[in-house]
């Protein structure tokens, strides 16, 4: 013969369990009372709010059960805040003070059953109503270097009005893997030291590109470093203003107009700096006439090559950071 999990309780215990049920009903009534305001919210917002409030309610009940146990053992009680105010607060406190000492996992199961039974959207309990991992997402950030007040005049950027580049009605987006092990490399200590010496240098610091240099990359007559979109480790290092400044439209592509781009700075591990231009370059194929998009560093790249003694087959890495809000690159030669 099946028995309910509270059949072993005496009359007082059953009464306490009954009051717990009343508490759940009361919580459900409060949600129904707020139905009009919730109708104005999206389904996702409504569900997130329900998850959060039910999670807090379960935690509250668990803490009050702990408080009841401490009081029974003779320990001094601790003050516990509730979710509700006014008459509803006093009514709920009356029931909460007599809750049975059930494990929190049982309380969670109980509230999940009550919530599911009354949920008009038929939300399954398998959606992990009380999974707090959904609300505790962390993000690893690069170190931020702040030695002095950032000055917009210390690092200048030239903006030009451009249209968004389009090819055959489709925009070509850079491909990158934000979760690659390469992109997760730690910031080199030398870069942090260089940034401390720069006025207005700050993070976030991002590793965006790695390459084995070709003969063309170090050829003086070319005087530029091409960075293919699909070889980027990440493409979130530009501000909206910078993206507009380096963008090109169809007319500019056909006219092969010289692009201005944005002014940028490259530094090496010896704190030496070079001023360059950063822009988008279109490499057209002779047969098809289709263009491939690249980022490019030019108008000073030869100085970077000679100053760092770069040659073909050298492995380099490019990191980005900010100087007074302006895009800067750090060149690491391996």
UniProtKB/Swiss-Prot annotation:
It comes from the Eukaryota. Its main location: nucleus. Residues 73-84, 141-157 have a biased composition (Polar residues). One of its GO terms (molecular function) is DNA binding. Keywords: DNA-binding, Nucleus, Transcription, Transcription regulation. Residues 161-173 have a biased composition (Basic residues). Residues 69-89, 133-178 are annotated as: Disordered. Residues 229-334 bind DNA. It is found in: Nucleus. Coiled coil: none annotated. InterPro entries: At2g31720-like, B3_DNA-bd, DNA-bd_pseudobarrel_sf. Pfam families: At2g31720-like. GO terms for cellular component: nucleus. This is Putative B3 domain-containing protein At3g49610. It comes from Arabidopsis thaliana.
């Amino acid at each position: 013969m099946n028995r309910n999990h509270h059949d072993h309780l005496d009359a007082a215990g059953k009464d306490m369990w009954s009051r717990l049920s009343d508490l759940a009903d009361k919580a459900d009534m409060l949600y129904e009372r707020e139905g009009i305001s919730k109708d104005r919210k999206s389904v996702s917002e409504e569900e997130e709010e329900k998850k959060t409030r039910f999670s807090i309610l379960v935690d509250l009940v668990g803490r009050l059960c702990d408080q009841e146990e401490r009081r029974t053992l003779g320990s001094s009680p601790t003050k516990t805040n509730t979710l509700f105010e006014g008459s509803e607060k006093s009514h709920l406190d009356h029931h909460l003070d007599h809750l049975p000492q059930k494990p929190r996992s049982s309380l969670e199961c109980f509230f999940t059953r009550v919530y599911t039974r009354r949920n008009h959207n038929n939300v399954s309990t398998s959606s992990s109503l009380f999974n707090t991992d959904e609300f505790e997402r962390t993000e690893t950030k690069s170190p931020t270097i702040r030695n002095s007040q950032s000055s917009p005049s210390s690092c200048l950027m030239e903006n030009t009005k451009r249209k968004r580049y389009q090819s055959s009605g489709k925009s070509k987006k850079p491909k990158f893997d934000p979760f690659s092990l390469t992109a997760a490399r730690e910031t080199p200590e030398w870069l942090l030291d260089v940034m401390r010496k720069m006025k207005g240098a700050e993070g976030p610091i991002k590793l965006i590109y790695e390459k084995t240099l070709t003969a063309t990359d170090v050829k003086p007559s070319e005087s530029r470093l091409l960075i293919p979109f699909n070889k980027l480790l990440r493409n979130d290092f530009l501000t909206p203003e910078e993206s507009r400044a380096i963008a090109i439209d169809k007319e500019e592509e056909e006219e092969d107009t010289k692009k201005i781009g944005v002014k940028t700075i490259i530094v090496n591990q010896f704190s030496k700096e070079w001023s360059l231009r950063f822009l988008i370059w279109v490499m057209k194929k002779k047969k098809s006439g289709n263009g491939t998009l690249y980022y490019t560093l030019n108008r000073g790249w030869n100085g970077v090559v000679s100053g760092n003694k770069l040659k073909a087959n050298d492995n380099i890495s490019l990191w980005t950071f900010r100087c007074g809000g302006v895009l800067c690159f750090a060149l690491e030669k391996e």
